[in-house]
Protein backbone atom coordinates (compact mmCIF):
# COMPACT_ATOMS: atom_id res chain seq x y z
CA UNK A 1 0.00 0.00 0.00
CA UNK A 2 1.68 3.19 -1.25
CA UNK A 3 0.34 6.08 0.82
CA UNK A 4 -1.13 4.05 3.68
CA UNK A 5 -2.12 7.00 5.89
CA UNK A 6 -4.02 8.95 3.23
CA UNK A 7 -7.66 8.67 2.23
CA UNK A 8 -7.11 5.87 -0.32
CA UNK A 9 -4.69 4.05 1.96
CA UNK A 10 -6.89 3.99 5.04
CA UNK A 11 -9.92 2.84 3.03
CA UNK A 12 -7.88 0.10 1.33
CA UNK A 13 -6.68 -1.17 4.70
CA UNK A 14 -10.26 -1.16 6.00
CA UNK A 15 -11.20 -3.43 3.08
CA UNK A 16 -8.28 -5.73 3.90
CA UNK A 17 -9.62 -6.00 7.44
CA UNK A 18 -13.11 -6.79 6.16
CA UNK A 19 -11.77 -9.66 4.04
CA UNK A 20 -8.87 -11.14 6.05
CA UNK A 21 -9.26 -14.49 4.29
CA UNK A 22 -8.66 -12.82 0.91
CA UNK A 23 -6.11 -10.06 1.49
CA UNK A 24 -2.85 -9.82 3.42
CA UNK A 25 -0.99 -6.53 3.77
CA UNK A 26 2.75 -7.07 3.26
CA UNK A 27 4.13 -3.56 2.67
CA UNK A 28 3.21 -0.02 3.69
CA UNK A 29 4.62 3.36 2.69
CA UNK A 30 3.63 6.63 4.33
CA UNK A 31 4.48 10.29 4.66
CA UNK A 32 4.52 12.02 8.05
CA UNK A 33 1.72 10.49 10.16
CA UNK A 34 3.96 8.28 12.28
CA UNK A 35 1.39 7.51 14.99
CA UNK A 36 -1.07 6.18 12.40
CA UNK A 37 1.69 4.07 10.83
CA UNK A 38 2.30 2.50 14.24
CA UNK A 39 -1.41 1.64 14.52
CA UNK A 40 -1.35 0.14 11.02
CA UNK A 41 1.68 -2.00 11.90
CA UNK A 42 -0.17 -3.27 14.97
CA UNK A 43 -3.28 -4.13 12.98
CA UNK A 44 -1.82 -5.49 9.74
CA UNK A 45 1.63 -6.91 10.62
CA UNK A 46 3.37 -5.86 7.36
CA UNK A 47 6.75 -7.27 6.41
CA UNK A 48 8.17 -3.87 5.47
CA UNK A 49 7.33 -0.22 6.16
CA UNK A 50 8.91 2.77 4.41
CA UNK A 51 8.62 6.44 5.32
CA UNK A 52 9.12 9.13 2.69
CA UNK A 53 10.94 11.35 5.21
CA UNK A 54 14.04 9.62 6.58
CA UNK A 55 14.22 12.06 9.51
CA UNK A 56 11.06 10.48 10.94
CA UNK A 57 12.49 6.97 11.08
CA UNK A 58 13.93 7.34 14.63
CA UNK A 59 10.52 8.50 15.86
CA UNK A 60 8.84 5.48 14.28
CA UNK A 61 11.36 3.12 15.89
CA UNK A 62 10.93 4.85 19.25
CA UNK A 63 7.13 4.57 19.15
CA UNK A 64 7.28 0.90 18.19
CA UNK A 65 9.79 0.09 20.94
CA UNK A 66 7.65 1.96 23.48
CA UNK A 67 4.60 -0.23 22.88
CA UNK A 68 3.62 -2.45 25.83
CA UNK A 69 4.44 -6.10 25.21
CA UNK A 70 0.78 -7.03 24.81
CA UNK A 71 0.43 -4.44 22.01
CA UNK A 72 3.55 -5.45 20.11
CA UNK A 73 2.94 -7.01 16.67
CA UNK A 74 4.02 -10.66 16.28
CA UNK A 75 7.05 -9.45 14.35
CA UNK A 76 8.44 -6.00 13.69
CA UNK A 77 8.62 -5.04 10.01
CA UNK A 78 11.78 -4.08 8.20
CA UNK A 79 11.92 -0.28 8.44
CA UNK A 80 13.10 1.79 5.47
CA UNK A 81 13.04 5.46 4.54
CA UNK A 82 13.64 7.96 1.78
CA UNK A 83 13.08 7.56 -1.97
CA UNK A 84 15.03 4.30 -2.19
CA UNK A 85 13.12 2.88 0.76
CA UNK A 86 9.82 3.68 -0.94
CA UNK A 87 11.00 1.96 -4.12
CA UNK A 88 12.07 -1.16 -2.22
CA UNK A 89 8.69 -1.38 -0.46
CA UNK A 90 6.84 -0.76 -3.73
CA UNK A 91 8.59 -3.71 -5.37
CA UNK A 92 8.44 -6.02 -2.33
CA UNK A 93 8.79 -9.61 -3.42
CA UNK A 94 5.76 -11.13 -1.67
CA UNK A 95 3.31 -8.49 -2.94
CA UNK A 96 0.97 -9.54 -5.77
CA UNK A 97 -0.81 -6.19 -6.14
CA UNK A 98 0.37 -2.67 -5.34
CA UNK A 99 -2.22 0.00 -4.55
CA UNK A 100 -0.80 3.41 -5.51
CA UNK A 101 -2.50 6.03 -3.35
CA UNK A 102 0.25 8.62 -2.87
CA UNK A 103 -1.12 12.05 -3.73
CA UNK A 104 0.48 13.90 -6.62
CA UNK A 105 3.67 13.38 -8.57
CA UNK A 106 5.40 12.12 -5.40
CA UNK A 107 3.91 8.74 -6.25
CA UNK A 108 5.61 8.50 -9.65
CA UNK A 109 8.92 6.84 -8.73
CA UNK A 110 7.56 4.19 -6.33
CA UNK A 111 4.78 3.40 -8.80
CA UNK A 112 7.36 2.94 -11.56
CA UNK A 113 9.38 0.71 -9.23
CA UNK A 114 6.31 -1.50 -8.73
CA UNK A 115 5.72 -1.71 -12.49
CA UNK A 116 9.36 -2.57 -13.22
CA UNK A 117 9.10 -5.36 -10.64
CA UNK A 118 6.16 -6.80 -12.58
CA UNK A 119 3.56 -6.05 -9.91
CA UNK A 120 -0.07 -5.61 -10.85
CA UNK A 121 -1.09 -2.06 -10.02
CA UNK A 122 -4.29 -0.55 -8.64
CA UNK A 123 -3.82 3.08 -9.63
CA UNK A 124 -5.53 5.75 -7.55
CA UNK A 125 -2.62 8.13 -8.10
CA UNK A 126 -3.74 9.54 -11.46
CA UNK A 127 -0.86 12.02 -11.56
CA UNK A 128 1.59 9.20 -12.28
CA UNK A 129 -0.05 8.46 -15.61
CA UNK A 130 -0.85 12.07 -16.43
CA UNK A 131 2.66 13.39 -15.88
CA UNK A 132 4.61 10.41 -17.16
CA UNK A 133 2.48 8.35 -19.56
CA UNK A 134 5.26 8.38 -22.23
CA UNK A 135 7.44 6.64 -19.63
CA UNK A 136 4.85 4.54 -17.77
CA UNK A 137 3.01 2.98 -20.73
CA UNK A 138 6.10 1.43 -22.39
CA UNK A 139 7.22 0.16 -18.98
CA UNK A 140 3.84 -1.53 -18.48
CA UNK A 141 4.23 -3.31 -21.81
CA UNK A 142 7.77 -4.41 -20.99
CA UNK A 143 6.94 -5.76 -17.54
CA UNK A 144 3.55 -7.30 -18.27
CA UNK A 145 2.05 -5.57 -15.24
CA UNK A 146 -1.71 -5.10 -15.28
CA UNK A 147 -2.94 -1.62 -14.47
CA UNK A 148 -6.36 -1.49 -12.81
CA UNK A 149 -7.93 1.97 -12.32
CA UNK A 150 -8.91 2.56 -8.68
CA UNK A 151 -10.61 5.94 -8.99
CA UNK A 152 -14.39 5.86 -9.35
CA UNK A 153 -14.72 7.23 -12.89
CA UNK A 154 -12.12 5.08 -14.61
CA UNK A 155 -13.18 2.07 -12.59
CA UNK A 156 -16.70 2.66 -13.92
CA UNK A 157 -15.42 2.70 -17.51
CA UNK A 158 -13.27 -0.35 -16.82
CA UNK A 159 -16.26 -2.21 -15.35
CA UNK A 160 -18.51 -1.28 -18.28
CA UNK A 161 -15.92 -2.65 -20.72
CA UNK A 162 -15.68 -6.00 -18.92
CA UNK A 163 -18.72 -7.34 -20.76
CA UNK A 164 -17.42 -6.38 -24.21
CA UNK A 165 -15.04 -8.17 -26.62
CA UNK A 166 -12.51 -5.42 -25.82
CA UNK A 167 -12.19 -6.19 -22.11
CA UNK A 168 -8.61 -7.39 -22.66
CA UNK A 169 -7.57 -3.93 -23.84
CA UNK A 170 -9.16 -2.36 -20.79
CA UNK A 171 -7.58 -4.95 -18.52
CA UNK A 172 -4.11 -4.18 -19.76
CA UNK A 173 -4.79 -0.45 -19.78
CA UNK A 174 -1.78 0.43 -21.90
CA UNK A 175 -3.37 3.00 -24.15
CA UNK A 176 -4.34 0.52 -26.85
CA UNK A 177 -7.31 1.88 -28.84
CA UNK A 178 -10.48 0.03 -27.91
CA UNK A 179 -12.51 -0.96 -31.00
CA UNK A 180 -16.19 -0.23 -30.66
CA UNK A 181 -15.71 2.35 -27.91
CA UNK A 182 -17.05 5.55 -29.43
CA UNK A 183 -17.43 7.94 -26.51
CA UNK A 184 -16.69 8.32 -22.80
CA UNK A 185 -18.75 10.51 -20.50
CA UNK A 186 -16.94 11.33 -17.27
CA UNK A 187 -19.42 12.41 -14.63
CA UNK A 188 -18.48 15.18 -12.21
CA UNK A 189 -20.25 16.23 -9.03
CA UNK A 190 -19.42 19.86 -9.77
CA UNK A 191 -17.45 20.15 -6.54
CA UNK A 192 -17.87 22.57 -3.70
CA UNK A 193 -18.95 25.43 -5.97
CA UNK A 194 -21.35 23.67 -8.31
CA UNK A 195 -24.25 25.86 -7.15
CA UNK A 196 -22.23 29.08 -6.97
CA UNK A 197 -22.20 31.65 -9.75
CA UNK A 198 -18.88 32.47 -11.40
CA UNK A 199 -19.13 35.97 -9.89
CA UNK A 200 -19.54 34.60 -6.36
CA UNK A 201 -16.24 32.74 -6.62
CA UNK A 202 -14.52 36.04 -5.78
CA UNK A 203 -15.67 35.36 -2.20
CA UNK A 204 -14.51 31.71 -2.09
CA UNK A 205 -12.51 30.69 0.98
CA UNK A 206 -10.34 27.68 1.79
CA UNK A 207 -13.11 26.30 4.00
CA UNK A 208 -15.56 26.61 1.10
CA UNK A 209 -13.24 24.92 -1.40
CA UNK A 210 -12.41 21.98 0.88
CA UNK A 211 -16.03 21.06 1.68
CA UNK A 212 -17.13 18.48 -0.89
CA UNK A 213 -20.89 17.88 -1.14
CA UNK A 214 -20.68 14.15 -1.97
CA UNK A 215 -17.26 12.57 -1.48
CA UNK A 216 -14.93 12.23 1.50
CA UNK A 217 -11.44 12.96 0.12
CA UNK A 218 -8.18 14.68 0.99
CA UNK A 219 -7.88 18.47 0.85
CA UNK A 220 -5.85 18.68 -2.36
CA UNK A 221 -8.20 16.54 -4.45
CA UNK A 222 -11.22 18.33 -2.93
CA UNK A 223 -9.84 21.65 -4.19
CA UNK A 224 -9.18 20.00 -7.57
CA UNK A 225 -12.83 18.99 -7.60
CA UNK A 226 -13.86 22.57 -6.86
CA UNK A 227 -11.83 23.89 -9.82
CA UNK A 228 -12.84 20.88 -11.98
CA UNK A 229 -9.12 20.29 -12.57
CA UNK A 230 -9.65 16.85 -11.08
CA UNK A 231 -12.00 16.03 -13.93
CA UNK A 232 -9.66 17.59 -16.46
CA UNK A 233 -6.84 15.38 -15.20
CA UNK A 234 -9.21 12.41 -15.47
CA UNK A 235 -9.80 13.28 -19.14
CA UNK A 236 -6.05 12.93 -19.75
CA UNK A 237 -5.98 9.71 -17.73
CA UNK A 238 -8.91 8.26 -19.73
CA UNK A 239 -7.10 9.09 -22.97
CA UNK A 240 -4.04 7.14 -21.87
CA UNK A 241 -5.89 4.27 -20.19
CA UNK A 242 -8.37 3.51 -22.93
CA UNK A 243 -6.65 4.86 -26.06
CA UNK A 244 -9.50 7.19 -26.98
CA UNK A 245 -9.19 10.62 -28.61
CA UNK A 246 -9.83 13.76 -26.58
CA UNK A 247 -12.71 14.69 -28.89
CA UNK A 248 -14.48 11.53 -27.70
CA UNK A 249 -14.20 12.29 -23.97
CA UNK A 250 -16.86 14.52 -22.46
CA UNK A 251 -17.38 15.90 -18.96
CA UNK A 252 -20.94 16.13 -17.65
CA UNK A 253 -22.04 17.56 -14.29
CA UNK A 254 -24.06 14.97 -12.36
CA UNK A 255 -24.78 16.41 -8.89
CA UNK A 256 -25.98 13.17 -7.32
CA UNK A 257 -22.72 11.26 -8.08
CA UNK A 258 -24.68 8.03 -8.58
CA UNK A 259 -23.61 7.30 -12.18
CA UNK A 260 -19.83 7.19 -11.96
CA UNK A 261 -19.20 7.34 -15.71
CA UNK A 262 -20.63 6.03 -18.98
CA UNK A 263 -19.41 4.62 -22.27
CA UNK A 264 -21.09 4.78 -25.67
CA UNK A 265 -20.51 1.85 -28.02
CA UNK A 266 -20.57 1.58 -31.81
CA UNK A 267 -24.26 0.68 -31.98
CA UNK A 268 -25.19 3.79 -29.90
CA UNK A 269 -25.78 1.78 -26.71
CA UNK A 270 -24.71 3.58 -23.53
CA UNK A 271 -23.48 1.62 -20.51
CA UNK A 272 -22.97 3.15 -17.07
CA UNK A 273 -21.90 2.00 -13.62
CA UNK A 274 -24.04 3.12 -10.68
CA UNK A 275 -23.55 3.13 -6.93
CA UNK A 276 -23.46 5.35 -3.87
CA UNK A 277 -20.47 7.74 -3.83
CA UNK A 278 -18.04 5.57 -1.88
CA UNK A 279 -14.39 5.09 -2.88
CA UNK A 280 -14.33 1.66 -1.26
CA UNK A 281 -16.24 0.13 -4.17
CA UNK A 282 -13.71 0.88 -6.95
CA UNK A 283 -10.86 0.00 -4.59
CA UNK A 284 -12.48 -3.35 -3.76
CA UNK A 285 -12.99 -4.13 -7.45
CA UNK A 286 -9.27 -3.61 -8.07
CA UNK A 287 -8.43 -5.93 -5.19
CA UNK A 288 -10.91 -8.67 -6.14
CA UNK A 289 -10.89 -8.40 -9.97
CA UNK A 290 -12.05 -10.33 -11.91
CA UNK A 291 -14.24 -11.60 -9.08
CA UNK A 292 -16.88 -9.66 -7.18
CA UNK A 293 -17.03 -10.16 -3.42
CA UNK A 294 -20.18 -10.17 -1.32
CA UNK A 295 -20.29 -7.12 0.96
CA UNK A 296 -22.68 -5.87 3.65
CA UNK A 297 -22.43 -2.37 2.23
CA UNK A 298 -25.42 -0.13 1.67
CA UNK A 299 -27.35 -1.04 -1.49
CA UNK A 300 -28.35 1.53 -4.08
CA UNK A 301 -32.05 2.42 -3.95
CA UNK A 302 -33.05 4.55 -6.94
CA UNK A 303 -36.43 5.36 -5.41
CA UNK A 304 -34.53 6.80 -2.45
CA UNK A 305 -32.30 8.81 -4.79
CA UNK A 306 -35.42 10.15 -6.50
CA UNK A 307 -33.83 11.75 -9.54
CA UNK A 308 -30.65 11.79 -11.57
CA UNK A 309 -29.81 15.10 -13.23
CA UNK A 310 -27.13 16.20 -15.68
CA UNK A 311 -25.85 19.46 -17.13
CA UNK A 312 -22.93 20.70 -19.16
CA UNK A 313 -20.13 22.34 -17.16
CA UNK A 314 -19.76 26.13 -17.32
CA UNK A 315 -16.43 26.75 -19.07
CA UNK A 316 -16.20 30.30 -17.66
CA UNK A 317 -16.69 29.03 -14.13
CA UNK A 318 -14.28 26.11 -14.62
CA UNK A 319 -11.34 27.37 -16.76
CA UNK A 320 -9.12 24.52 -15.51
CA UNK A 321 -11.14 22.12 -17.63
CA UNK A 322 -10.06 23.89 -20.83
CA UNK A 323 -6.44 23.99 -19.63
CA UNK A 324 -6.45 20.23 -19.10
CA UNK A 325 -7.85 19.46 -22.55
CA UNK A 326 -5.25 21.76 -24.12
CA UNK A 327 -2.38 20.17 -22.19
CA UNK A 328 -3.60 16.69 -23.06
CA UNK A 329 -3.79 17.50 -26.76
CA UNK A 330 -0.30 19.06 -26.66
CA UNK A 331 1.00 15.82 -25.14
CA UNK A 332 4.64 15.14 -24.35
CA UNK A 333 5.79 17.05 -21.30
CA UNK A 334 2.84 19.47 -21.22
CA UNK A 335 0.60 17.30 -18.99
CA UNK A 336 3.49 17.06 -16.51
CA UNK A 337 3.74 20.86 -16.43
CA UNK A 338 -0.03 21.17 -16.01
CA UNK A 339 -0.04 18.67 -13.16
CA UNK A 340 2.94 20.14 -11.31
CA UNK A 341 1.71 23.72 -11.72
CA UNK A 342 -1.68 22.67 -10.40
CA UNK A 343 -0.20 20.87 -7.40
CA UNK A 344 1.87 23.91 -6.51
CA UNK A 345 -0.98 26.37 -7.13
CA UNK A 346 -3.32 24.38 -4.88
CA UNK A 347 -0.62 24.21 -2.19
CA UNK A 348 -0.19 27.99 -2.40
CA UNK A 349 -3.96 28.44 -2.12
CA UNK A 350 -4.18 26.15 0.93
CA UNK A 351 -1.39 28.19 2.54
CA UNK A 352 -3.42 31.38 1.89
CA UNK A 353 -0.83 32.87 -0.46
CA UNK A 354 -3.19 33.14 -3.44
CA UNK A 355 -6.93 33.38 -4.01
CA UNK A 356 -9.01 30.51 -5.38
CA UNK A 357 -9.38 32.32 -8.71
CA UNK A 358 -5.61 32.65 -9.02
CA UNK A 359 -5.23 28.87 -9.38
CA UNK A 360 -6.09 28.62 -13.12
CA UNK A 361 -4.22 31.86 -13.85
CA UNK A 362 -0.86 30.64 -12.57
CA UNK A 363 -1.34 27.20 -14.17
CA UNK A 364 -2.05 28.75 -17.56
CA UNK A 365 1.00 31.01 -17.26
CA UNK A 366 3.28 28.04 -16.59
CA UNK A 367 1.84 26.08 -19.53
CA UNK A 368 2.29 29.07 -21.85
CA UNK A 369 5.91 29.47 -20.77
CA UNK A 370 6.59 25.79 -21.46
CA UNK A 371 5.32 25.75 -25.05
CA UNK A 372 8.70 26.55 -26.72
CA UNK A 373 10.39 23.81 -24.65
CA UNK A 374 7.79 21.07 -25.12
CA UNK A 375 9.31 17.61 -25.56
CA UNK A 376 7.16 15.12 -27.43
CA UNK A 377 8.96 11.91 -26.36
CA UNK A 378 10.30 12.62 -22.88
CA UNK A 379 12.37 10.27 -20.76
CA UNK A 380 11.92 9.99 -16.98
CA UNK A 381 14.59 12.63 -16.28
CA UNK A 382 12.80 15.04 -18.63
CA UNK A 383 9.50 14.54 -16.79
CA UNK A 384 11.15 15.12 -13.41
CA UNK A 385 12.92 18.24 -14.73
CA UNK A 386 9.78 19.90 -16.11
CA UNK A 387 7.92 18.94 -12.93
CA UNK A 388 10.50 20.84 -10.87
CA UNK A 389 10.51 23.74 -13.34
CA UNK A 390 6.72 24.16 -13.24
CA UNK A 391 6.63 24.19 -9.44
CA UNK A 392 9.35 26.82 -9.37
CA UNK A 393 7.52 28.85 -12.02
CA UNK A 394 4.38 28.98 -9.88
CA UNK A 395 6.34 29.82 -6.73
CA UNK A 396 8.11 32.68 -8.49
CA UNK A 397 4.88 34.07 -9.89
CA UNK A 398 3.23 33.98 -6.48
CA UNK A 399 6.18 35.89 -5.00
CA UNK A 400 5.67 38.59 -7.62
CA UNK A 401 2.08 39.21 -6.60
CA UNK A 402 -1.41 38.27 -7.67
CA UNK A 403 -2.79 36.88 -10.89
CA UNK A 404 -2.21 38.14 -14.44
CA UNK A 405 1.40 39.10 -13.73
CA UNK A 406 4.01 37.83 -16.22
CA UNK A 407 6.39 35.08 -15.15
CA UNK A 408 10.06 35.93 -14.70
CA UNK A 409 12.67 34.13 -16.74
CA UNK A 410 13.32 30.80 -15.07
CA UNK A 411 15.56 27.82 -15.43
CA UNK A 412 14.77 24.33 -14.15
Swiss-Prot record:
It is an enzyme of class 1 (oxidoreductase). Its EC number is 1.1.1.267. Mn(2+) binds at residues 151, 153, 234. 1-deoxy-D-xylulose 5-phosphate binds at residues 126, 152-153, 189, 212, 225, 230-231, 234. It comes from the Bacteria. Belongs to the DXR family. Catalyzes the NADPH-dependent rearrangement and reduction of 1-deoxy-D-xylulose-5-phosphate (DXP) to 2-C-methyl-D-erythritol 4-phosphate (MEP). This is 1-deoxy-D-xylulose 5-phosphate reductoisomerase.
